[in-house]
């Protein structure tokens, strides 16, 4: 079956209808790593950059954080706002190609899950996330592993109305692009993790078997100097 490619915003607006119910091995891998990297957030100010349907937003809000969440997809934001854990979250519509709309040193923790593989201006975004972090802030960042591009994989879903495969536009960043942007933005890279599809992933998401052994996730734990 052929695949259509939509601009990122339009693609995620459409995907929002089924995103949380869509069986996704990348999310299976990513959730475990990001929970570890995000850490204890009780009483902390948290910014969720590109929050989508609020997967991480709802988790950190339920853990006692004061959360601000931003995304440029109104469809995704509507889904996030509807989650009961997110009733006290501040949601903003914002395009990440623009300067973040917050003063310097606003947040204790910054979360950015499966977003920046759609961003070509990496140095600018990493720099902005560093700017709005307080001294000593930490960040948890994840992307689809660039190795997936060798298999022709990108963020995509099956439209429930038509059965068509729809992909959301990506920036095709290399590992070196991410690492260079981190190093030039003032963050300290405390940890970098790569995760491949393993037996546990396949058990939770059987369709992942065709990617067995392939790196699917890359994630970073970053720190800002105190």
Short names for language-model regions:
Residues 170-193:
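Short alpha-helix
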Residues 1-42, 55, 59, 76-79, 138-164, 169, ...:
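Conserved class I S-adenosyl-L-methionine
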Residues 109-121:
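A short SAM/SAH-binding and catalytic strip from SAM-dependent methyltransferases
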Residues 123-138:
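A short glycine-rich, Lys/Arg-flanked "PGG" loop and its adjoining helix->strand segment in the class I
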Residues 47-98:
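Class I SAM-dependent methyltransferase SAM/SAH-binding core
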Residues 188-226:
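Conserved Class I S-adenosyl-L-methionine
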Residues 100-109:
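A short acidic, Gly/Pro-enriched loop at the edge of an enzyme's catalytic core
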């Amino acid at each position: 079956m052929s695949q259509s490619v939509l601009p990122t915003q339009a693609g995620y607006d459409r995907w929002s209808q089924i995103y949380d119910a869509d069986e996704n091995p990348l999310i299976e891998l990513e959730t475990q790593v990001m929970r570890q990297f995000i850490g204890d957030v009780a009483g902390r100010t948290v910014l969720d950059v590109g929050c989508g349907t609020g997967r991480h937003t709802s988790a950190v809000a339920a853990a006692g954080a004061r959360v601000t969440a931003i995304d440029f997809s109104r469809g995704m934001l509507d889904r996030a706002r509807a989650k009961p854990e997110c009733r006290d979250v501040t949601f903003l519509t914002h395009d990440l190609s623009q300067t973040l709309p917050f003063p310097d040193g606003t947040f204790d923790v910054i979360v950015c899950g499966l977003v920046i593989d759609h961003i070509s201006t990496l140095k600018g975004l990493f720099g902005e996330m560093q700017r709005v972090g307080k001294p000593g802030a930490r960040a948890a960042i994840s992307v689809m592993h660039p190795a997936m591009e060798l298999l022709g994989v990108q963020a995509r879903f099956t439209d429930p109305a038509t059965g068509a495969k729809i992909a959301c536009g990506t920036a095709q960043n290399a590992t070196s692009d991410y690492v260079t942007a981190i190093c030039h933005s003032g963050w300290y890279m405390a940890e970098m993790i790569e995760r491949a599809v393993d037996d546990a992933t396949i058990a939770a998401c059987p369709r992942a078997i065709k990617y067995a052994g392939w790196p699917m996730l890359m994630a970073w734990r970053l720190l800002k100097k105190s």
